[in-house]
């Protein structure tokens, strides 16, 4: 799944920032490159979020407890960035497994993931600064924790690194792919949907400033040792709109298949863009398919276009459910989750629900599907061992409670939805 960036010409309502100041004392040489998200950008301006609260001042007032590492520290932690310890690689650079001392108990070590950003000039620097600024001041059980950072000159030039908590169970994308030796059970998929909704709700609505993720996708949802899902990779995140503005205008960046249609067409970014991406992700969980897969037959390459004909007939609806589940799910649970996806995929961005409303709907589905389990996280099933305008709360509840033939299609009018 490739990322994209296309400029949209002159963006007159783009928020402008003063020249940045390095987040680390030894990174002054890079300041000339500029960034929208440096600490001075946060503290030296007075923009206010769409909720009417002072976004940047609120961010700067939050305590930043990030550790500052040296290149030497991280070489030691990763065995000199050993290829055998590489756990991820992409356009951003490479990610290595490592260990660092536990500050609370120096006799113990903790596992970490060290992201070494590639040399992509200004864009790479901006993404590094964005992650430091955002993840340095936010904390939530469904966001991957940033532990520290490093920005330092060595013989190869300026090195930019980020140190995260280690997520041993990889990404949701991996477990939905044929590469995975295990299958995410339906109950676990529901929990992942709930965890992801919690993370987005926190970013959009639970702070005194709003963060728009902008690159919500299954590969950016990681799983910890308890299979709790956490959002990761905030390099493309943006602050929400300032007062009097309905959106943030910006270059269109993200991942093909997840980006909201109005964002692609106009470059106007709102939190409802993330809601669209969440709807696409729900259909990934249901079908086990990627949003855009060129290896599929022509009529099946775009996920949203492929599922559309099956939504008008509840008997045929089963045909889009991930066959690796082998029928081990309650069909009404799947159908109700599809209703949530359809609400998120409403063509009119203003009519999409807020993430807090989405979270409430998904939570009800989880509770109905897993009664009496004591809140325990469902487990994986090894593949080889398997046997076989704004939506109102009242309307959302009615939609979820009614599951008769044709309702799926009625909620998602094919004329109003276009696959990206």
Swiss-Prot record:
The modification Phosphotyrosine is found at residues 164, 263. Gene3D superfamilies: Phosphorylase Kinase, domain 1, Transferase(Phosphotransferase) domain 1. Induction: Induced by infection with the bacterial pathogen Pseudomonas syringae pv maculicola strain ES4326. It catalyses: L-seryl-[protein] + ATP = O-phospho-L-seryl-[protein] + ADP + H(+); L-threonyl-[protein] + ATP = O-phospho-L-threonyl-[protein] + ADP + H(+). GO terms for biological process: defense response; pattern recognition receptor signaling pathway; regulation of salicylic acid biosynthetic process. ATP binds at residues 87-95, 115. Residues 1-64, 369-396 are annotated as: Disordered. Its EC number is 2.7.11.1. This is Serine/threonine-protein kinase PCRK2.
